[in-house]
A protein has these predicted regions:
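Structured soluble/peripheral alpha/beta segments that form catalytic or ligand/cofactor-binding pockets
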Residues: 1-190
């Protein structure tokens, strides 16, 4: 696909390289959320071109009115991609810790974490009896925020995005450095 922002002189071309689906517990019709943790991107800004890895999440459904979440998507060039969330939809808890591992083989392997949780500067999960710690710097090198509203619905949520340096540790051993997008949002969804 292509995204064009002519007023900013930006064009992004992307290709979906990995896609996974699963349901969110609070969605009344059990519609699956689509996760695309590996978008292969080319970003053109005037006379400059940059390669990038992107993420897309697509969901539609009948959700409770209130929600809140912390989400992180991190890319480690020599190891893989981690995406993780700790969320509440209404009174339903929803969290996950996923690793798209590219370090062991040429074939990508999706590993699902258990016992996952988030803190202000970290996300944690257990995968195959190993403890994964995704740590990110307290200082963002780029950030953006906005109030999300839709009419005629009553959605009003504050969305914040922050880009930060990240470190991946497995069983207290550092295995990689990368970049992460930390996203958090709280308010109403309907």
């Amino acid at each position: 696909g292509t995204i064009c922002l002519p007023e900013a002189n930006i064009e992004i071309q992307f290709q979906v390289a990995a896609e996974f689906t699963w349901a969110v517990p609070a969605e009344k019709n059990h519609r699956a959320v689509i996760h695309q943790p590996k978008l292969l991107c080319t970003v053109n800004t005037g006379d400059r071109t940059q390669k990038a890895i992107g993420y897309c999440k697509i969901y539609d459904g009948d959700y409770p009115k209130f929600w809140g979440y912390h989400f992180v998507h991190a890319f480690f060039p020599d190891y893989g991609i981690i995406w993780s969330a700790e969320a509440t939809f209404g009174e339903e808890k929803y969290n996950y810790f996923k690793l798209l591992n590219t370090s062991q083989t040429e074939k990508e392997i999706l590993l699902n974490g258990e016992d996952s949780y988030h803190r202000k500067t970290s996300a944690h999960g257990r995968i195959q009896d190993k403890i994964y710690h995704l740590k990110f710097d307290n200082n963002a090198f780029a950030n953006w925020s906005s109030i999300l509203r839709n009419q005629p619905s009553t959605m009003e949520s504050k969305l914040c995005l922050e880009y930060r340096p990240a470190i991946l540790e497995i069983d207290d051993q550092k295995v990689g450095e990368g970049i992460c997008l930390k996203e958090f949002c709280f308010g109403t969804i309907t």
